[in-house]
Structures are given as structure tokens and as C-alpha cells.
A protein has these predicted regions:
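Short N-terminal segments immediately surrounding and downstream of signal-peptide cleavage
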Residues: 15-30, 87-95, 233
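Collagen/collagen-like triple-helix sequence repeat recognition
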Residues: 43-78
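Coil residues (strongly favoring Ser/Thr
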Residues: 36, 47, 62-63, 69, ...
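Short amphipathic beta-strand/extended segments with alternating polar/hydrophobic composition
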Residues: 26-32, 61, 247, 312-315
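Bacterial Sec-dependent N-terminal signal peptides
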Residues: 1-17
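N-terminal targeting signals for Sec/Tat export/insertion, comprising classic cleavable signal peptides
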Residues: 21-46
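A short, compositionally biased
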Residues: 11-15, 42-45, 83-87, 308
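Conserved positions within compact, well-structured domain cores
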Residues: 77-339
């Protein structure tokens, strides 16, 4: 696979976009699919400021003409792994932007491999533990009291050097004592160590509350049958054929995500191509017990509160607010890449 990419643009209108999403190269305003290309040896590249600001796109190996206006040429001096693409462009401070990973972080214990979920809506849920039975609560979501941690997991205690990045079932917060060690220091999929990182408390807070039009760029929903929370990118332009309603339901309940708004997989592909990020309501883990799956979502920050607690972003159908929680609880992780 290629390790680097060079690009030149001959001519292109500034109102058009070129993006890669869900196995398709998309172009135009409104975005249209280009079906005549092959998609091996993909690479991420930034634009030459002729597209929308900071648009991330992916192009194929060798030379290809796109809509008779864009000339893309790959030119590399060596072999290497293809890095992962990011989703959207999001301000997390007055002078910093990030792009989100394509899915929640996952870890396979038997192979010591870190990876991202294939789709943004994917989550492991009650299968984070083995043994026991699933109890479905129509208000709060699915619960399961297991007997052991599964081989593949995506709910982690707060990451310190003493806990194998939070892959631990200890319920004692003292066992998670120490400074944070970012999950992004690992090799994740084909990405080199330190490619990705965890948002701090201040960055999550800025994304949720402070950036321009923050309240208009977040909302609960159900995507492809999965409950969760959507964050829209800074320069949001809603694609044709779909609409987005920001905000939250007035009450907390599993069914109220879908009652607020829903998107099919096809509709979501348009939103994702336009930079939308979806955080599934994956519940949380305490020891060998998993709770509130599809009722709530909980996403770690990199910031400690004290020796026993750290900050995270929890959400339900009724709201999303930063709180401090026990380090020993297992929560979801969605990493970002600095731009």
C-alpha cells in the first residue's frame, strides 16, 4: 500500500466538495456518488484550499480524473500501511480543530490489537462480558451481569499505566490511580502510535457548549436502529434529501431517541459524508456488569477530577452534560486527530 500521496487541482468550484465515505467517492453540491472508480490503496489528504475549508478527502492509487475538473496523482517513494480517515472538522477551542475517528475504540485481548469500529453506530454492548443473561428494561436499556470480560471489548476504565489502558474489571478506583495514559499512544489498526488522542474536559465542553452555533450542531437520534448522539461539523451544510433536528427530547427513555428523529443507513451515509459524527448509546460497565445499553452513552475525557474520578460526557435522550465519574467504570472512547 502507498505511504504518501501528492495532489494537484487544475480547476474546481469552491462550492463543491470531494469526500470519501462508506465506500464511495462523493463529489459536488449536492454531493453525488461517482461509481466508475476503484478504491484500493486509499489515502487521506487535505485540499489545496480550493474545496470547502479543511475538507478531508480520499483518493485512489494511480492517476484518475474526477468530473473532468480535478486531477489527482499519487507519488510515493516507499511502501506502508494506509492510515484511517477522520470524520468532519470540529472546533474544540478558539484556535484548534480536530477530526473524529470513524468509530468507537475497540480492543481484542487475545491478539493485543486496538481498532476502530467499522461503522459509527457499531458498539459491543452487553457482549463486553460473557456469561449471564440480558435483561431488557424498556425505560433504561439492556443490562447484563456476566462472569468474565469478553475477548473483544469497547468499554474501558479510565486509562492509566497500571490498568492496560483501562482493560480491567476492578471496581476499586484506587487500582486506577495515576496520571492518564492516552489510548492514542497505541497503534490502532494501521495507524502509527500517537496518531489519535482523547479530548480533554475543556475540549469536550467547548465542542458541546462554546463553539459557534453549538446548540444547533448537536442532537439525539436513532441511526440504522441504534440510539445515540450526533455532533455536526463547524461548517455544516445539510445534504439534500435529509433534514436534521438539533436538541433533545423532553424525557429520558430508550424509545425517545427514535421518537425525536430517525435516520436510515442510506440517510446516515449522506450525513456522514457531510461530516456528521454519531456516538452510539453503548451503556457502561462496572466490573462484570454492563448496564443501560441503548439508554445512555458515556464517553471518556483525558482529564482527571481527583485520584478517584475523571470527567466524561454522558448523554441520554433528554440531554448531554459533562460530569465526573468513578475511574473504575467502563465507558466508551471516541478518539480525535488534530488538524
Amino acid at each position: 500500500m502507498l505511504a504518501c500521496v501528492a495532489m494537484s487541482v487544475l480547476a474546481m468550484g469552491q462550492n463543491n466538495q470531494l469526500v470519501w465515505a462508506n465506500g464511495r467517492l462523493l463529489y459536488g453540491t449536492p454531493i453525488e456518488s461517482i461509481d466508475s472508480l476503484t478504491y484500493d490503496a486509499m489515502q487521506d489528504i487535505d485540499t489545496l484550499h480550493l474545496l470547502l475549508p479543511r475538507t478531508l478527502i480520499k483518493v485512489v492509487h494511480d492517476t484518475v480524473y474526477i468530473h473532468d475538473t480535478v486531477y489527482v496523482e499519487t507519488d510515493c517513494g516507499g511502501e506502508g500501511d494506509t492510515p484511517s480517515a477522520g470524520i468532519g472538522v470540529f472546533s474544540v477551542s478558539a484556535d484548534k480543530q480536530v477530526t473524529f475517528s470513524k468509530g468507537n475504540l475497540q480492543y481484542t485481548q487475545s491478539t493485543n490489537i486496538w481498532s476502530f469500529a467499522e461503522n459509527q453506530w457499531d458498539y459491543i454492548g452487553t457482549d463486553n462480558v460473557i456469561g449471564g443473561s440480558v435483561y431488557s428494561n424498556p425505560t433504561y436499556g439492556d443490562d447484563k451481569n456476566g462472569t468474565a470480560l469478553a475477548d473483544k471489548v469497547d468499554l474501558f476504565g479510565w486509562s492509566t499505566s497500571a490498568t492496560n489502558f483501562g482493560v480491567s474489571t476492578s471496581k476499586d478506583d484506587d487500582d486506577y490511580y495515576g496520571s492518564f495514559v492516552d489510548w492514542g499512544t497505541n497503534k490502532i489498526g494501521n495507524d502509527a502510535p500517537n496518531t489519535w488522542r482523547t479530548l480533554t474536559y475543556d475540549e469536550w465542553h467547548y465542542l458541546r457548549y462554546t463553539r459557534t452555533n453549538a446548540d444547533d450542531l448537536v442532537g439525539v437520534t436513532q441511526v440504522n436502529g441504534v440510539n445515540g448522539l450526533i455532533f455536526l461539523p463547524d461548517n455544516w451544510v445539510c445534504p439534500s434529501g435529509v433534514s436534521f433536528k438539533s436538541g433533545f427530547h423532553s424525557r429520558d427513555c430508550v424509545d425517545y431517541y427514535a421518537a425525536y428523529q430517525t435516520f436510515t443507513a442510506d440517510q446516515w451515509s449522506k450525513l456522514e459524508a457531510a461530516g456528521a459524527v454519531f456516538l452510539p448509546a453503548a451503556g457502561y460497565r462496572h466490573g462484570f456488569g454492563v448496564s443501560t445499553v441503548q439508554g445512555t452513552g458515556h464517553y471518556w475525557s483525558a482529564t482527571e477530577y481527583d485520584s478517584n474520578c475523571a470527567y466524561n460526557l454522558p448523554f441520554s435522550s433528554g440531554g448531554a452534560h459533562m460530569v465526573n465519574v468513578n475511574r473504575s467504570d467502563g465507558y466508551s472512547v471516541r478518539l480525535v486527530k488534530d488538524l
